[in-house]
Amino acid sequence: SARTKGLIPVHLYGQAANMDPLMELAQKHHLRVIEDTAQAFGSDYHGKKLGTIGHVGCFSFYPTKILGAYGDGGLIITDDDQIAEVARTLRAHGAKRNYYNEMVGYNSRLDAIQAAILSVKLPYIDQWIAGRREAARNYNRLLKDMPGVIIPYEAPYTKHVYNQYTIRVLNGKRDQLWRQLHEAGIGTMIYYPIPVHKLPVYERTAPSLEVSERYAGEALSLPIWPQMEMETQRLVVEKISEIVNG
């Protein structure tokens, strides 16, 4: 609409959104593109690193992310000097120099301890991504023929880094599977139980989005980490089969 100022593609679970059509749309309507790369550090789109395609790339260093700090942290990258200046000002209470606030800002500075931890972990990131991708391939082999389960799809234009390995559980059995896996000591997560348009803050924007609502009732993220052993994955999949097809 005439009120639209920008687009925010989300590289969900570790896989790139299809950026070319979005960038073409943005160029046509003079919009800014802000990439949400929180779950996809190290992934790419047609060989170009995510976060470097749009006007701004946003990264999360929360401990559960591909590259995680010990606490909260994040990064914004851009090649636009004006955006960079505003971002630097916003992160420091809206001030370019001490005690001289020019806009309403935040305390969003990355502290030295988090930066040090990230600096130590960064050299291992390619190795850890390779480990996640191998674990995902193992899950794919173990789950691909299981009735009632749809495994993740890796788009041909990207390298999925599997911040989450998220399956779809059909026939209304997702919540039962989540509950019984939890009872068996297998940690899984539901990302995300409520679609954005159903949250109170946005519920007036769209009365119904059927695909989003269906997927929200089917998505289940299985345990995955770079050093995950095949035997552990077999145990997870055996329990899933027992519950879904029992």
What are these regions (language model features)?
Residues 1-69, 75-77, 225:
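Active-site phosphate-binding strand-loop segment of PLP-dependent enzymes
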Residues 67-71, 158-161:
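Short glycine-enriched loop/turn motifs at secondary-structure junctions
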Residues 6-10, 15, 19-21, 28, ...:
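PLP-dependent aminotransferase class I/II
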Residues 53-54, 72, 165, 181:
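Acidic, glycine-centered active-site loop in nucleotide-sugar glycosyltransferases
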